[in-house]
A protein has these predicted regions:
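Conserved short submotifs of the Hanks-type protein kinase catalytic core
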Residues: 21-35
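C-terminal lobe helix-coil module of Hanks-type protein kinase domains
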Residues: 32, 55, 61-62, 66, ...
Length: 251
């Protein structure tokens, strides 16, 4: 699958095959970087800078989707960032080609392959995985990058409770999640940072994390457009016009 992808935001595949004892292997580009959440904590002190990094990730995922590939396992350890701030999407081990049946695979507690903390509702229901699944997972990643924690209050290691939250509960607001996050992981000026966790950003992430895949953005490019609108202080399509204070007033 990875051999189909040629994008600056996706780690290159050099070779692959099987060992003499039948074990699959592949060799890929070495990425001198760490998990995206660690990079944000160490280097990105503002909401805007973190949204710009999310746009890099979204562009890489858009490239995969244009090649009819869904990643299915978007999480911090699969998004590496080097010292120059260049994103590299790695580990397509759970990826699938759209329109092709999946080979039998190991599952999590009888479900399809996934990382529960970042899995979409349809993955817990064993429903088909589509581009909308990546959009949901990307939104959870964005929520973690921006707020410092996952979008639901329960413990993700409690599989049944987490599955219930993902399929039934609404996510917290970014500001509320930020308030509940670890103090040691917050930016140096938390009050200023929190002011920029606006309703527009909440609206974008909530749309992308809709329980029904059909209610999410129709494509990663559509979500990217709303994130770009946020950065440019323009209205986002995810939010209906209303009297609430928007981003422009928070600047």
């Amino acid at each position: 699958i990875l051999a189909c992808l040629h994008d600056s935001g996706i780690a290159l595949l050099f070779d692959g095959g099987e060992t003499l004892d039948g074990q699959p292997f592949y060799t890929m580009e070495y990425v001198d970087g760490g998990a995206v959440t660690d990079y944000c904590h160490a280097s990105l002190e503002s909401v805007d800078l973190r949204v710009r990094l999310l746009l890099q990730i979204a562009a890489a995922l858009s490239s995969a989707h244009r090649n009819l590939i869904v990643h299915r396992d978007i999480k911090p350890s699969n998004i590496l960032v080097n010292a120059e701030g260049q994103v590299k999407l790695v580990d397509f081990g759970l990826a699938k080609l759209l329109g092709r049946p999946m080979l039998p695979t190991m599952t999590h507690a009888g479900l399809g392959p996934m990382t529960p903390a970042y899995a979409a509702p349809e993955q817990f229901r064993n429903d088909p995985v589509t581009v909308a699944t990546d959009i949901y997972q990307f939104a959870v990643l964005g929520f973690v990058i921006l707020s410092g924690r996952l979008p639901y209050r329960c413990d993700p290691t409690d599989s049944l409770e987490w599955a219930r939250a993902v399929t039934e509960e609404e996510p917290m607001t970014l500001a509320r999640a930020f308030d509940l996050g670890e103090e040691a992981r917050k930016p140096k000026n938390p009050a200023r940072y929190r002011r920029h966790l606006t309703r527009d950003l909440d609206a974008v992430l909530r749309k992308a994390m809709a329980k029904d895949p059909r209610a999410r953005y129709g494509s990663m490019d559509a979500m990217r457009a709303d994130l770009e609108a946020f950065l440019e202080a323009r209205p986002v399509t995810a939010r209906r016009a209303g009297p609430e204070i928007g981003r422009a007033a928070c600047r």
